[in-house]
């Protein structure tokens, strides 16, 4: 797992950089087409006054976030389409001539994308390159080297390679329904207050670890 360091845009610039609330349903990956590190990419993006924006930048050492995940960003070139309105933008650094640093940034990006998939219940089918939305030749280096399929495969491996406690529950349809009904009763009884837990159950992406924590929380609230 990679820590995502926040360096968020000032709310006074929301109208320019991220004007709309968003529930992420896709993840879009890009190449930066330069050789700056993640912090520099984010610092420049949040500091200027043009509309171009993205959520995170990933380099060989870290992941830096500039736009909140619950707000849209202008990174897909599809106007008010699904890419700009419903996808998290991930910029992969050092793609111009970064050598081994670039490939390490790619590895890190696969890990963080897998994390975001799990966090927001996004299926692998909804993880796409920038080119998917507007036809732009991006991520340029992956396209040049014909490696988008292998990058998607690395994301799958990162997603599936987590420890058992971080794996999504494997339940039958009736079991998911029963879990939703039972947790709904606990929520109505005030045993927990965050409805996002119910959303995760409804979307069938609750992990073993999360269920254990939730059960312990409900038990403790009954003492």
Region locations from a protein language model:
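Short, solvent-exposed alpha-helical surface patches in non-cytosolic proteins
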Residues: 163-223
């Amino acid at each position: 797992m990679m820590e995502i360091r926040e360096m968020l845009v000032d709310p006074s610039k929301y109208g320019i950089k991220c004007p709309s609330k968003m529930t992420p349903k896709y993840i879009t990956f890009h190449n930066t087409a330069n050789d700056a590190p993640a912090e520099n990419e984010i610092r420049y993006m949040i500091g200027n006054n043009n509309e171009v924006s993205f959520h995170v930048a990933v380099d060989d050492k870290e992941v830096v976030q500039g736009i909140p995940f619950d707000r849209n960003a202008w990174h897909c070139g599809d106007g008010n389409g699904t890419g700009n309105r419903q996808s998290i933008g991930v910029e992969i650094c050092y793609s111009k001539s970064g050598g081994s640093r670039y490939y390490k940034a790619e590895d890190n990006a696969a890990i963080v994308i897998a994390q975001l998939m799990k966090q927001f219940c996004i299926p692998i089918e909804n993880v796409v390159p920038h080119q998917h939305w507007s036809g732009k030749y991006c991520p340029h280096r992956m396209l040049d080297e014909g490696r988008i399929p292998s990058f998607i495969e690395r994301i799958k491996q990162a997603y599936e390679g987590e420890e058992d406690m971080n794996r999504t529950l494997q339940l039958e349809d009736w079991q998911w329904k029963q879990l939703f009904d039972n947790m709904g009763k606990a929520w109505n009884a005030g045993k927990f207050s965050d409805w996002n837990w119910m959303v995760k159950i409804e979307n069938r992406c609750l992990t073993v670890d999360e269920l254990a924590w939730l059960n312990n929380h409900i038990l403790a609230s009954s003492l």
